[in-house]
Amino acid sequence: MFIKIIKSWIIELISPFVFLRFKNIFELKKYLKANEKYTGICASVYNRYMFIRGSYIGITCEFKNQPYFPHGILGIFISDDTIIGNNAVIFQQVTIGSDRLSDTDNLGSPIIKDNSYIGAGAKIIGNVTIGNNCRIGANAIVYKDVPDNSVAVASPMRIIIKENKMDNRFFVKRYNGDIKFYENGYFHKK
């Protein structure tokens, strides 16, 4: 018990220095994955950060660039080995999970391609591919592939294929009237 308390204090003491070195949690994750460091002080700081927020973003999952979380990473679950493309927007309480049961037809982790928009509470489970420019509706449960330029809604899942490419950038109107959108890891002025 005493050792656990000491370890917890050490992690709390070292956390600010780790974040000074890596700037944000995603840079720390990138470092841990690149160097295959799944244990140690930096991994403990990363895991504690996720635990405090009720989230899990697997160290071995891959982001093409940093996704945008409009409500922060509270309650987000992204399993190991998931691949998420450029310009993803992921709302709160989303689960992007692998299917690891031996008797499943869907064994593996999801692949989410570029310009995806994943609504609050959505669940994407197993070895599925979400195509480019797709939207996943709030509370949708996705268990099969979604083609490019589609919307997946409800449970049981329905897929609506769109004729034209959808603009899934996340827009924000600021108090001064400026409109900005999130793309390639940054907000840009419209």
What are these regions (language model features)?
Residues 1-54, 164-190:
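Terminal amphipathic alpha-helical/low-complexity segments used for targeting or macromolecular assembly
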Residues 150-152, 156-170:
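Conserved beta-strand-loop-alpha-helix hinge in the C-terminal portion
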